[in-house]
């Protein structure tokens, strides 16, 4: 399948509470800046995919909202009471997906993690090409337990189940797992080991610039196309 159009949805927590498992590597202010940089590289990579015709960001954070708009994305308001919701991420994604369905009933919806600084556009293009048109599909993260991306074609609810063991939860809820060599898509960043792994892949320019400033080891990705190659036509 290669859908005519897809809208990507990305949910991002407040920068104040982001990436606590990197506390042993980065100070709080630097963790916030890292989240913002990784988000920027993720959005830029998604925006470079021809089939992705729009990106919507759900966040309570004004800095993320401002960055999203500067990158050409829309900002969807976080659902009321989300701060007290133990399943706030899935509630936010589902709410945004429902709103998108009402506006673009013929488009697919792709829920994407916000911390994929090594993401290459052709990885997402390949995912959308291989995704079924009659059911949801997931791409597991590098550990095989989480979900890097969840796709729902037109007419099928997204039904996000992100969180602990989300890959298993999505599979048991009917989503088909897609298998492909997509290391940048699968490598989210939660721990120091994850940060080292994505540095070995090469990161997008925003993340690379921050790592350079912080004098952490890095490989600079000057442009997405230089390292990833051209995005295949749909």
Language model regions located:
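Short phosphate-binding loop-to-helix
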Residues: 67-108, 166
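A short, N-terminal amphipathic alpha-helix
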Residues: 35-52
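N-terminal nucleotide-binding beta1-loop-alpha1 segment
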Residues: 1-22
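Short, glycine-/small-residue-rich phosphate/pyrophosphate-handling segment
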Residues: 148-175
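Conserved alpha/beta core of the MobA/IspD/sugar-nucleotide pyrophosphorylase nucleotidyltransferase superfamily
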Residues: 165-234
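Acidic donor-binding segment of Leloir-type glycosyltransferases
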Residues: 51-75
């Amino acid at each position: 399948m290669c859908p005519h159009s897809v809208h990507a949805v990305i949910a991002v927590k407040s920068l104040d509470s982001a990436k606590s498992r990197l506390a042993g590597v980065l100070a709080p202010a630097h963790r916030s800046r890292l989240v913002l940089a990784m988000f920027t590289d993720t959005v830029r990579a998604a925006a470079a995919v021809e089939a992705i015709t729009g990106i919507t960001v759900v966040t309570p954070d004004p800095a993320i909202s401002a960055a999203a708009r500067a990158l050409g994305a829309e900002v969807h308001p976080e659902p009321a009471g989300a701060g007290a919701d133990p399943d706030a991420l899935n509630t936010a994604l589902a709410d945004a997906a429902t709103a998108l369905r009402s506006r673009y009933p013929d488009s697919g919806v792709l829920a994407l993690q916000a911390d994929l600084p090594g993401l290459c556009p052709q990885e997402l293009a390949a995912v959308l090409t291989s995704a079924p048109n009659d059911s949801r599909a997931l791409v597991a993260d590098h550990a095989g337990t989480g979900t890097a991306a969840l796709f729902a074609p037109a007419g099928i609810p997204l039904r996000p189940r992100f969180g602990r063991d989300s890959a298993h939860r999505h599979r048991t809820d009917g989503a088909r797992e897609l298998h492909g060599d997509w290391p940048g898509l699968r490598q989210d960043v939660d721990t120091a080991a994850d940060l080292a792994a994505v540095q070995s892949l090469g990161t997008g320019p925003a993340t690379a610039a921050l790592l350079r400033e912080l004098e952490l080891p890095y490989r600079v990705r000057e442009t997405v196309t230089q390292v990833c190659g051209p995005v295949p036509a749909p």
